[in-house]
């Protein structure tokens, strides 16, 4: 069940519980979403026929199957910050996060109007034809193919090694970022991956999120 498997997830938990309920109800039913903390509130929702199309997509059970058990108790302690590890000091700021939200959160890239090249992160000069022509904003595809990768055993991480991948995205564009939920022996050039939105680091006094990849799984 939702309380037995992931445990209580804090702020996100009511919405996860709502998702679990919406997987079982039918159009036209009422669903109450209560939440408590410093006070309490509740939202009353009514399902519509659009629910059935949503239910045909990925379900919570399929998402739970992606979970990878931690190899050792030491990994658990490290993730919970109960043991000291190598310190990292990431930098960020709310101003920077706001200014770059289109690329960092919405995955908006630039398409060169002169040669059609898609590049991410966006630049004011096309890296292919060096044109300074107008650029169109396009959203990067959800999936792509690994071009090359590396397993970094020196970068500070509670779950070493850190797997970094270069991915050619469907429809154009290339991105370099971290691969998660995978072991080094599961990664290979040519494997298909998909984007996931994950916690990145704590910098500038705030939690920062960014896009990472995981191995593609259908269904």
Which residues are covered by each model-predicted region?
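Cys/His-rich short segments
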Residues: 88-145
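OB-fold/S1-family single-stranded nucleic acid-binding modules
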Residues: 188, 196-219
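Short nucleic-acid-contacting surface segments enriched for D/E, G, S/T with interspersed K/R
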Residues: 181-195
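Claisen-condensing/thiolase-fold acyl-transfer catalytic domains that form or cleave C-C bonds
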Residues: 1-87
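Short, acidic/hydrophobic/Gly-rich beta-strand patch recurrent on exposed beta strands
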Residues: 163-170, 178, 212-214
